[in-house]
Amino acid sequence: MDKGQHFVFFVLTTVLLLRESSHAGAMRNDAAASKDTDLRGPEENLPTLTVTTILEDPYVMVRRAELEGYCIDLLKALASMLHFSYKVKVVGDGKYGAVSSNGNWTGMIGEILRQEADIAVAPLTVTSAREEVVSFTTPFLQTGIGILLRKDTMSQEMSFFHFLAPFSKETWTGLLFAYILTCFCLFLVARLSPCEWNEPKNEENHFTFLNSLWFGAGALALQGVTPRPKALSVRVIAAIWWLFTIALLAAYIANFTALLSSGSEQLPIQTFEDLVKQRKLEFGTLDGSSTFYYFKNSKNPIHQMIYEYMDKRRDHVLVKTYQEAVQRVMDSNYAFIGESISQDLAAARHCNLIRAPEVIGARGFGIATAQASPWTKKLSIAVLKLRESGDLDYLRNKWWETSCLHKSRERWSPLQPQALGGLFLTLAIGLALGVIAAVVELSNKSRHAAGHVKKSCCSIFTEEMCTRLRIKENTRQSQETSGRANA
């Protein structure tokens, strides 16, 4: 019996211990569950924003049934900084936002006004018309209006005067003036210097003005021509002119070589004025975009001509989407006018496209919110912090990465006078030294002559100066006198 009682007591004790252990484990599991709920509580209580956007590469794209792109990364960074959750929806009508014929706003702006979305995170341009109905944050991207072209449709045609292209018109004008001035200085110095003739009253000087022009032209061709200078003053001018022509020809050959080697990279359409003047390409923009209304409201005559062209051919030249515009540029003779930053992306993705140099209408992409929304200022401060930390630059480089191998050659342009400023200055100094040397030579001769004829040096110098500057008249008078004597 004792053994039986001990056995029963052991069984009861074991059952009680197991029951307490099970109850304690259950208590611990309930506590853990309660703790997990507390951790999820703050996440579940985060404000949820409905975000409207538009599908445009590289801002928002659909890949593997998920959205990604520049704006999605930006939205994630803002949500992390401001502690909110979000739901992203693509705008129903596929438009950015403009006033329709019935006075209502379309696109993402319309969805915010109808309270279908809280904010719009997209390449949405900040304009005065949109600012009147919604609020914008600080721009997260800066852009402008540019011209997207196809390279092979814009190869520059050679003209008969293409050889003049290495220098600008101002440079050619300066060179012509320098040539005439140098030849005149040669002519003047040769007449003043006593070393260029023995008897100026009886002998004609070899450096006439026509001969001086011929001498200067021969130096331009790197050819030695007569007359040969004998005086130091004339040789100074001749030497400085030779150095000038050598440097000038080197600059011309280098720039002309760069012009020929650049080939099709030289765009005849550099500006919007060039676009209006040409007749080879059609041009247009996105229908209802801020770019279209920029030209409509502009007072610039060139911009008005662009608007009138697009408005008259609205059904033919205006496109519905950015992807359609890029494809049309690649497939036909069409130039697309739009956001320069988007055109840079197209040129990076498609190596046969290029953006014209001129960019007008500086503007920015901002996040749109409802007016008086408490999120406007918060988002603006967050965007500024992302810019200051370099995160916006990182996103820009990440999504605008190019697959093209661009040559590191700079775009060619005609040589301007400023580039040859030092060369012109050297020539001017040489001409001045030559004239001074000629005056010194004539002064020395006048001083020696004054000692023989018992006259002042100044009077002799003046007589010599007048005689040499009127030598042709004196020679003609002497010839007429000799002719009368023979008669």
Swiss-Prot record:
UniProt keyword terms in alphabetical order: Cell membrane, Glycoprotein, Ion channel, Ion transport, Ligand-gated ion channel, Membrane, Postsynaptic cell membrane, Receptor, Signal, Synapse, Transmembrane, Transmembrane helix, Transport
Localization: Cell membrane; Postsynaptic cell membrane
Membrane-spanning residues: 170-190, 236-256, 420-440
Major subcellular location class: membrane
Residue intervals annotated with topology Cytoplasmic: 191-235, 441-487
Gene3D superfamilies: Periplasmic binding protein-like II
Ligase is among the record's keywords: no
Family membership noted in the UniProt record: Belongs to the glutamate-gated ion channel (TC 1.A.10.1) family.
Protein name as it appears in the record: Probable glutamate receptor
